[in-house]
Structures are given as C-alpha cells and as structure tokens.
Regions:
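Conserved alpha-helical scaffold flanking the Walker A/P-loop in AAA+ ATPase domains
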Residues: 34-37, 103-119
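Helix-loop-helix "sensor" segment of P-loop NTPases
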Residues: 115-119, 150, 159, 167-226
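Walker A/P-loop nucleotide-binding motif
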Residues: 41-61
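The conserved phosphate-sensing helix
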Residues: 216, 227-242
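Conserved NTP-binding/hydrolysis module of P-loop NTPases
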Residues: 11-12, 71-73, 81-100
C-alpha cells in the first residue's frame, strides 16, 4: 500500500531486487573480489556471516558476475546433504545420471570436469550454501574431492557458505584440522555500521524511484540498532506507519 503513497516505481526492501541494484559495503566488495580470485585460481574458500548479513546477496552477485562463457557454476543448498547426494546433486546439474556408489560417482564427476576443462575450456565453481548445517563426513568429502592428481592441480573452485558457527563451532576445532589445512581463503561479512546502514536504505529507496526524504536521521539511528541487510521489516514498518499516520490525519 505504501508504494502508491510514496510514488514508487518498484517495491524496496524485498529479496528480488536485481543484484546490480543492491547496496555493496566496502567489506562486501572486498569479499566479492576475493571470491572472483578464488574462482579464477580454482581455490577452496569459506565465507561466513551472522544470519541476514548478506551471504545470499553476496552469492547472487558473485554468480551474476562470473562470465558464462568461462565458468560453469554448480550450487547446492541442503542441510541433509550426504556425500552420495553431494555427487548426485552436482552430476544432475551437469545433466548426468550419477552412479550408485560414492567412489564411482566421484570418479564420474572428476572425469566430467576434465572434459569441461579440456574440451569446453571452462572452469567449474561449486558453491555449497548453508554449510554450517553439514555433517563432518560431508565436509570431509570436499577435501577428498580436491585431492586430485597428487595435488598437482585443483579440479574446481569450492566455496562453502554458512553462518558464523561453520567456522567457530566446526572448522576451528582440532577434529576438522585436515579440512582447515586445505582452505585457501576465509572471508567473513560484518554487520553494517551506521553510515553503511544509511547508504543501504538509500540504495533501496533509489531503486524504488521515490524522490521523497522518507527516513529522518532519528529513524536511521533506530533502524541501525536492529537491522541486518537480509531482514527488511524495520524500514518497511516505518513506511507503513507513515502511510497510516497520514491517512488518519486526512
């Protein structure tokens, strides 16, 4: 209801804002650049952040910026993912029917990646979202997959994305040391500071096409206390309240 009241062309503070219209903090841009380097060099990276701090937005942006003529991106997000279903999920995305046994599926995937690299001259990027929910056995499989040709070459880039506990409660522990030693890059997205919160709100309002100054300095202060980029309710509540207040005064 507030879109018409404020003369908006698009709805702000929703999840389907085009990636190129999203606000990018300096930490966001730095992490995006590091992931591009990971993809190019076919490295193993881990990205963590608190819930709602922009992990999904980062992955959307990362995916949209990878040239389709140079990369094939495989994406999985399944809290119950087992090693067997990990290989099946990747092979399904490549249009192949996976073999029954895990070892056979792994070799099948490695052979297909060799074809992609050698014939299509493309690099493969595998993104595993919600990785903080995965069991140790599945996380170990990434290490085994990257043990390729006596470690002389990495067959693909692997990016594990998850909440902060992926690193703090799992990968930092001694029992995960073998996995941690294979990690080439670790990135974390922090919460926005007050200035970044104001820019974040401004980017959404610019996308909406609204020319009015809707959010006062005090409103931005209050939003900054509670907002994280993936949770849009605080600014939306203010927009709705403004409409209701003006409606009651008319």
């Amino acid at each position: 209801m507030y879109e018409a009241f404020f003369g908006m062309e698009h709805t702000p503070f929703v999840r389907d804002v085009p990636p190129e219209k999203l606000y990018e903090s300096s930490a966001f841009r730095e992490t995006l650049g590091r992931l591009s380097y990971v993809a190019d060099r076919q490295m193993f990276a881990v990205v963590t952040a608190d819930s709602g701090c922009g992990k999904s937005t980062l992955i959307r942006r990362f995916y949209s910026e990878l040239p389709k003529e140079d990369y094939i991106v495989l994406y999985l997000s399944d809290s119950k993912l087992t090693p067997r279903w990990f290989y099946k999920g990747l092979l399904d995305q490549l249009g192949l029917e996976s073999r029954f046994y895990r070892g056979d599926s792994k070799r099948q995937l490695q052979q297909e990646i060799e074809i992609i690299r050698g014939v299509q001259h493309k690099k493969v990027v595998c993104i595993l979202d919600e990785a903080h929910l995965l069991e140790k056995e599945t996380l170990e499989e990434f290490r085994f997959l990257l043990n390729y040709k006596f470690d002389s070459v990495s067959p693909m880039a692997v990016v594990l994305v998850g909440q902060t506990e992926l690193w703090e409660n799992k990968l930092k522990l001694q029992r995960y040391a073998a996995i941690r030693q294979r990690i080439d890059m670790y990135c974390t997205l922090p919460h926005l500071d007050r200035s970044e919160t104001e820019q974040y709100i401004g980017s959404h309002m610019a996308y909406s096409g609204c020319s009015q100054e809707v959010f006062t300095e005090k409103a931005v202060d209050e939003i900054h206390k509670v907002i994280i980029p993936g949770l849009f309710e605080p600014p939306v509540r203010i927009l709705r309240a403004t409409v209701l207040e003006n409606g009651s005064q008319s």
